[in-house]
């Protein structure tokens, strides 16, 4: 998305500080767990049980983000109820029940404003590095032991009471990223946890124990067992993080990231992108273009390997095509700018300008900002589509 103007870096920083401060106050005064729809869900689950029995708790990312004052998107709930009990309880309600992962004890409740994923408490019986055979239980501590990181095993009930059997809140407060139990064993249970490790390391700039780093490097070959679709989903989550541009600051993290994604040949280009990121929003497609595109069509290999979406494929192809044009057409951002905005769209040209600066070391910041201002000032005419004049 285009910001609509060319804000200075200090102005944008001040805006972000104010926005985060307001959000923090808002979340403290109106915590997510007090939402009316969520309370209806918890009350429905509790029906038929005595008040001293905890039937459901929030868990995972929503609790972690609540504690760190981040925006909460996905809502995960752990419960002692079976999927059949959940379906029966919500059969004649305003919530639609979707069997998203019923083989693993998961269903999703969909309402007007929320999608809530409910999973029955469980323990792993057998794992193969990709999937697990599970047994359903009603023991909260045992359920916590099968989760990946301590910071993802913090539970929160409908009244805001924390249950933290793995001391995840302590690790979150002290910037520690720890597997629950033996790192080697946890990684071997599901090799996707290696990629998830990168996501949380980038997200919180967390301190990692040497045993964890060693276990990850020793098990990198296991990534080959994971479907490319699952890996791509995690990668896109990583690229959406505001801290991703700092990945080069940790040689250890960069090494692991490069081993998992050897297609990203141009991580150094991120250093130039860091100089201009404040001028526009940076999305995953821009980052992919910066790290992938070269004269050998490296991006095509990535698209094929990870079966990227048609949208991503088309966007990268368009970036590549126009970067080639930029080399040939010296007037691309000059006399031909209006024409190129008309045929490609203003958003695309803003992104292309970012990518071109990141890739081409000969482009100065002055040239970049000058081009950006010209793009933003162009008014693209809206033509009527109903035949009227």
Spans of model-derived segments:
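Short, positively charged low-complexity motifs
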Residues: 2-4
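Catalytic cores of the polymerase beta-like nucleotidyltransferase superfamily
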Residues: 14-389
């Amino acid at each position: 998305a285009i910001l609509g103007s060319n804000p200075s870096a200090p102005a944008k920083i001040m805006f972000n500080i104010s926005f985060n401060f307001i959000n923090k106050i808002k979340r403290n005064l109106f915590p997510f767990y007090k939402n009316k729809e969520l309370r209806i869900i918890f009350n429905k689950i509790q029906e038929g049980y005595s008040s001293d029995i905890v039937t459901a708790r929030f868990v995972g990312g929503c609790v972690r983000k609540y504690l760190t004052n981040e925006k909460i998107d996905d809502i995960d709930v752990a419960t002692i109820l079976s999927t059949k009990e959940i379906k029966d309880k919500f059969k004649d309600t305003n919530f639609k029940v979707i069997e998203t992962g019923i083989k693993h004890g998961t269903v999703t409740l969909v309402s007007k404003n929320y999608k809530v994923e409910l999973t029955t408490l469980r323990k792993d019986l057998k794992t193969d590095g990709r999937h697990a055979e599970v047994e359903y239980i009603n023991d909260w501590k045992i359920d916590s032991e099968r989760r990946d990181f301590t910071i993802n095993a913090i539970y929160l009930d409908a009244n805001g009471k924390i249950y933290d059997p793995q001391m995840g809140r302590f690790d979150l407060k002290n910037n520690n990223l720890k597997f629950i139990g033996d790192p080697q064993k946890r990684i071997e249970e599901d090799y996707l946890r290696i990629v998830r490790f990168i996501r949380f390391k980038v997200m919180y700039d967390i301190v990692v124990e040497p045993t964890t780093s060693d276990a990850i490097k020793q098990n990198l070959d296991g990534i080959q067992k994971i479907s490319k679709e699952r890996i791509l989903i995690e990668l896109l989550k990583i690229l959406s993080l505001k801290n991703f541009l700092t990945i080069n600051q940790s040689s250890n993290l960069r090494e692991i990231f490069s081993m998992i994604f050897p297609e990203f040949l141009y991580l150094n280009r991120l250093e130039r992108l860091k100089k201009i990121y404040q001028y526009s929003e940076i999305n995953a497609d821009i980052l992919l273009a910066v790290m992938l595109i070269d004269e050998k069509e490296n991006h095509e290999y990535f698209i094929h390997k990870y079966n990227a979406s048609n949208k991503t494929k088309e966007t990268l192809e368009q970036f590549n095509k126009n970067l080639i044009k930029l080399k040939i057409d010296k007037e691309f951002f000059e006399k031909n700018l209006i024409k190129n905005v008309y045929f490609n769209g203003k958003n695309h040209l803003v992104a292309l300008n970012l990518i071109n600066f990141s890739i081409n070391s000969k482009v100065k910041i002055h040239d970049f900002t000058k081009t950006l201002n010209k793009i933003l000032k162009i008014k693209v005419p809206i033509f009527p589509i109903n035949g009227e004049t």
